Structure formats: structure tokens, C-alpha cells
Amino acid sequence: MSRISFDQLLEAGAHFGHLKRKWNPAMAPYIFMERNDIHIIDLHKTVAKVDEAAEVIKGMAKNGKKILFVATKKQAKEPIAELAKSVGMPYVVERWPGGMLTNFPTIRKAVKKMTQIDKMTADGTFDNLSKREKLQITRQRAKLEKTLGSIADMNRLPSALFVVDVMKEHIAVREANRLGIPVFAMVDTNSDPSLIDYVIPSNDDALKAIELIVGTMCQAINEGLMERKAEKPEEEETEEAAPRRERRARSGARRSRQNENEATAEAATEVAEAPEAEEAE
């Protein structure tokens, strides 16, 4: 059974593409028809692509991978932030910091700077600064929080990107392509699908369509996380059982050596007593 239905997508307006004159010919396989000079997306293909993408994303989450959500367009910011946070995934909803992926060490330094400021506040160092220094640091902290706060826990490059609006987020897509990071994306009729690893043909402007598709991806992530959590106790039990098996094996080996030693001693005694018996005769 599909994770998402044709009717749900239709109701969300996911089928509305862009004007015919704005189309990208590479999206032709995903276009159903043209109506009133607007391309209509084939939602049957959208359903299949959503299922495909969701299964891959679920597997990534199950393996402890991080998926970075990127959506800086106005109508997508709030829902993407909420959905990504609900499954503990990093996200970017403000301006994409150039080099965020290709120059990741520098981005991590900026995040560490934010952490250092927090430590200064916690240990009282901040209180000893002048008013001017306090103001400068407070402004710097606010700026860092706005652009990097949502990725503060991302200690390494993400395993994948999920992008809403390929054209608007072209810098993020290009950086991911350069590093070989898989890209999942909602791709409208005016975009180039060749840059995307997992294409989900859809209207990328309609809020309902964005919430529906991204919500489905986050549900798949949550399933993967739950399966990962369920498997951990089994792994712990296996790890606990291993030492017990080793102890039993060592104990068995000791008993075996003890039996061998006893058998050897008995044989030696018999050999020693044999001549005495002959002499007695």
C-alpha cells in the first residue's frame, strides 16, 4: 500500500506545474497534460516516487544517518522547521550559507564560536565584559543562531539533503552534487531533475503539497528511528550474552584439560605399577 494517495496529492494541489513557457523539457516524463497553458503533473508517478524516496530515507534513519532539510522560501520555512525538529533532523530555512557543505570545517568553527559564547554566559565571563563588548557578542550570537542554530548538532556532513524548490536552492544542490551527497527533492516542471537523485515531481509552491510530502518523509524517518531503537535492546542482549558464552567456553576448556591431566596421571600410575606386578610373580 502506498504511503500517500492520488486523492491526497490532488487535494493538496500537487499536480499544478508552471506555465508552459517556463517548463524544463527534462521534466517531460512527469507531465500528464497541459491545461490553460499550465502543465499538469502526473500524480500517479508522484505517488510512486514518494514511496521510493520514503523507503530510502527510512533506511538511512534506521542506520543513524542525518538528512538535512533545505527550504528557504517563505511559505515553506515554518512547516519544514517544525517537521524536521519533530524527528530530530537538521534543517536550513534561512539563507543558505555558501560553502556550508563544501567548506564544512569553517561552518563547524562558527558553530563552536556560538557554543563558546554560551559557555561565557554560563560561567560568568560575559558579565565581566564592557557594555560595548556585550552588545557585539550578543549580536554575533543572534546572527549565528539565526543561520546555524538549526544545524548546531550536525557534527559531520549529512548523509542526504531533502530540498523544496530545486531552483531556489540551486547552491545547496550544487554543493551536494560536488560531494556526492544524495539529493531528494520536490521538483516542479520548471526545474532540472538531472541534478536530483530522488525526484518527487510536484508543485513546490503550494503549502499543502509541501506539508503533505515532507510530512510523509518525516513519518518514514520516524519509522526508521523506531526500528533502530527496537533493535538496540537485542544488540545489547547479544553483547551481554557473548561474555557468558566465552566464560562457558573457558570453563569447558578447563574441565577438558583437567580430565586430560587426570587420565594422564592414571596412565602413568599403571605404567609404574606394571613391573612390580611382574616381579611379584
Swiss-Prot record:
A Pfam family hit:
Ribosomal_S2
Q: Does the record carry Ribonucleoprotein as a key word?
A: yes
Sequence ranges of Low complexity compositional bias: 262-272
Q: Which SUPFAM superfamilies match?
A: Ribosomal protein S2
Q: Name one GO biological process term.
A: translation
Q: Where is this region: Disordered?
A: 225-281
Recorded protein name is Small ribosomal subunit protein uS2
